Amino acid sequence: MTEQVKWLNEQEKALWGSFLAIEGHLHLAIQRDLKTSSNLTEPEFEVLVHLSEADGPVRMTALADALQWERSRVSHQVTRMTKRGLVQRTSCPEDGRGAFVSTTAEGMREIEKAAPDHVRTVRRVFLDRLDDDDKRELARLLAKVESGFDVTRTSAPSGVPSKS
């Protein structure tokens, strides 16, 4: 027996549509600014942010978990980035099947070049439009939505570099 579908009402449709539109606008702005400030795509930037903030090489499985990506997507992305000289993959000495990935000098140069403009974009198109109360409320609401997922992330979300 199939469960009865609870269709979206007008308010819910509008809310979902707004969420999708905002997500699209944010990604488009980030992609556009990455193209002008660096030679990185948004996925490359996300990978490099995570790797550049790690204390050494990162297991491929841990990278997939941190990015909330399928392992095959991470593998393909790392392969492309290896060909571009942005990262390097090494075998895990304890486990012949496992692999580590780390940034190269070129990858670090690209992330350092892209990070300032990326942070300015995140502020301009998202954070600066909210006051402190808005940010706290949005963080509360997003945590409420995120709590419904099986989140295996063990680190902070990638995509926004921290100033070290």
Question: In which residue ranges do the predicted regions lie?
Answer:
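N-terminal helix-turn-helix DNA-binding core of bacterial DNA-binding proteins
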Residues: G24, L28-S72, R84, T154-G159
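Short, locally clustered residues in the helix-turn-helix/winged-helix DNA-binding domain
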Residues: L20, V49-D55, A115, A143
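Active-site phosphate/pyrophosphate-handling residues
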Residues: A14, E46, R136
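C-terminal regulatory/oligomerization modules of transcriptional regulators
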Residues: M1-E10, D132-S164
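Charged, amphipathic alpha-helical coiled-coil/dimerization segments
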Residues: E3-Q4, T79-R140
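N-terminal leader segment of winged-helix/HTH proteins
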Residues: M1-S38, S162-S164
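Alpha-helical linker/hinge and terminal dimerization helices associated
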Residues: I22, L26, I30, L67, ...
